[in-house]
């Protein structure tokens, strides 16, 4: 794991997590983005945090509405249509 100047404590539950990156599930150590990605170069991005209950994200439609609205406001292409993003969300559960 990358080191930083911030104090943190490793959570053993995160040791074997898989991360969705560009259409594929990646092991933690393989989940990378290019340093030329606009999120790195420009610091742009939008995000939504989801609460999952019984295998389903609560209020997913409202979260996706806000995500796409935020992306539109900064001219950010999510890269997935709503259906594909919904499938990607469920793939991570």
Label the predicted regions.
Residues 1-93:
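Conserved alpha/beta cores of soluble small-molecule-handling proteins
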């Amino acid at each position: 794991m990358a080191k930083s100047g911030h104090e943190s404590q490793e959570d053993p539950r995160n040791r074997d997590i898989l991360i969705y990156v560009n259409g594929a599930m990646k092991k933690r150590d393989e989940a990378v983005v290019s340093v030329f990605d606009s999120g790195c170069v420009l610091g742009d991005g939008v995000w939504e945090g989801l609460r999952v209950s019984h295998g389903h994200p609560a209020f997913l439609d409202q979260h996706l509405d806000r995500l796409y609205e935020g992306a539109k406001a900064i001219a950010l292409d999510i890269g997935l249509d709503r259906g594909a993003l919904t499938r990607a969300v469920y793939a991570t559960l």
